[in-house]
Regions:
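Juxtamembrane regions of bacterial inner-membrane/periplasmic proteins
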Residues: 1-216
């Protein structure tokens, strides 16, 4: 039944499913901004082509190193999460791939139960069947929460740095990508030291993976 529901949800989805509640900008004829109309969430959708390559590399390096090799589920990471659950007696968010996180953010609640985790897995598999890896990354980076009311990396770039994501430096990109794992713990306003520490970890991951050089 859970699998059938996952198939139904993803089959009914399209690109617009992942663009809901976006912020609209009203421009004057000379190109100046007249007003900004916010949806339920403060979010600006940008295509993956408009994002710096470093944004994709950074988020994959910290959230889901095996993203381009799995089909929605990282079974080893999931097994580690199960072991931790058995030891601690509670369901944690660990073990979720980028695709599973997208499934949770778009189609499910944030409830931490095993049933929800199973639903997450089914939906993630269906998402991988229907959409390309680039599409999944685009949907993810436009919908994840970056704290302080900002949904999506463009909204976060404007909110924290007053710049478009395509204009961010590598350090700024890594800084933003540090936040979604735990927007409270890594809140740049109240816990900036934590954000900076995780940013440095991301940069080290990227360096170790050969995605950037010491010169960057």
């Amino acid at each position: 039944e859970l699998k059938q529901e996952a198939v139904r949800l993803v089959r009914q989805s399209d690109v617009d499913t992942f663009k809901a509640n976006q912020t609209s900008i009203v421009y004057a004829s000379d190109g100046s901004v007249i007003s900004t109309l916010k949806g339920e969430k403060d979010s600006y959708y940008v295509s993956i082509e408009e994002m710096p390559v470093d944004a994709v590399t950074a988020i994959v390096s910290i959230e889901d190193k095996k993203f381009f090799r799995h089909h929605g589920i990282d079974y080893r990471a999931l097994l580690r999460a199960v072991k931790a659950m058995v030891q601690n007696g509670e369901v944690k968010q660990g073990g979720s791939t980028i695709t599973m996180q997208l499934a949770r953010n778009i189609f499910l609640s944030q409830e931490k139960t095993w049933q929800r985790k199973v639903e997450e897995m089914y939906i993630a598999t269906e998402l991988e069947n229907k959409y390309s890896k680039d599409q999944i990354l685009e949907f993810y980076l436009n919908n994840i929460y970056f704290g302080n009311g900002y949904y999506g990396i463009q909204s976060a770039a404007r909110g924290y740095f007053d710049r478009d994501v395509e204009s961010l430096s590598l350090s700024q990109i890594a800084f933003l990508c540090a936040i979604p794992n735990n927007p409270t713990l890594y809140d740049p306003v109240t816990n900036k030291d934590n954000t900076v520490s995780r940013r440095d970890r991301i940069l080290k991951n990227m360096l170790d993976d050969g995605k950037i050089s010491q010169m960057d």
